[in-house]
Amino acid sequence: MTFDLSPGAWLAPVVDWLNTNFHGLFAAISAVIEAVLGGLQAALLFPPAYAVVLIAAALAWALLGWRAAILAAVALCFCYLLALWDESMETIALVSVSVAISVAVAVPIGILAARRPRLEAALRPVLDVMQTVPPWVYLIPAVMIFSLGRVPAIIATIVYGIPPMLRLTTLAFKQVRRDLIELGHAIGAAPRTILFKIEVPSAIPTLVVGLNQCILLSLAMVVLAGLVGAGGLGAEVTRGLTRMEMGLGLRAGLAIVAVAILLDRMSRAVLQRGHVQAARS
């Protein structure tokens, strides 16, 4: 006697039921994501390439100094010289939207979990499973619900990027010194003031690590999502793989490295700048 456990036997009816009863909700989610993603991509592609390079370099100079400005300019010029400018901008837009939503979901839950041990205990096995599941698996339900295109890629990337950000947010707020919080209560500070003036600045170093992990995992997922029609550099990697064109795959891979370095440095700079300003105030 053999046992055949097939998740598809019950998963397919569930997906059909969701598509039938929540089609309007999924269509609205798709429309919102497409609008935000399309607007950001259009904003990146509207000015000439040299203008984007100058803006990124100026922003990096203001946040981190001249070394970061040179790094940002070199990374973007490298993408342009590889003849992958449009694809690089599309990938930056995909990752930016995905990371922004992942952070918006993970940070509040992480703060709440740091204050509620039972919630943290309940979330721990869920996060363990989410971080153990191969990234390809996230694309399957997303494609089944949202069909092919950029939207399922964004949804899968958001889900894939939430666990590291949530874990490190919880850790960051648990590591805040209790005497600082007690001092805030002693001087009569409101809970909101304690959160934004004491806890958040103290948690910034660990939050930077979480954001870095979220960006890198999101970038990896966006590249894999080229298989489902997400576009960007992931589509070029997929094209190089299917056609056995090593040059195309290598060019796209190098552009991905440049984009990853750019996003990592800029995100770190923004958070660290906020940390310094909060400490001064």
What residue ranges belong to the model's regions?
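Transmembrane alpha-helical segments of polytopic membrane transport and secretion proteins
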Residues: M1-L5, A12, A27, R265-S281
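Interfacial loop/helix-cap signal at membrane boundaries in integral membrane proteins
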Residues: M1-P48
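Transmembrane-helix boundary motif in ABC transporter permease subunits
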Residues: A56-L63, A75-D86, V99-L127
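Membrane-spanning helices that line or support transport/gating and their immediate boundary helices
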Residues: E87-T91, I111, A121-P125, L168-Q175, ...
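Generic hydrophobic transmembrane alpha-helix motif, especially the helices
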Residues: L94-V97, S102-V107, I111-A114, R124-G161
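Glycine-rich helix-loop "coupling/hinge" segments at transmembrane-helix boundaries
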Residues: M144, S218-V259, L271-S281
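Transmembrane alpha-helices
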Residues: I155, V159, P191-A225, G247, ...
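Short cytoplasmic-facing helical segments at TM-TM junctions of multi-pass membrane proteins
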Residues: P164-Q213, V237
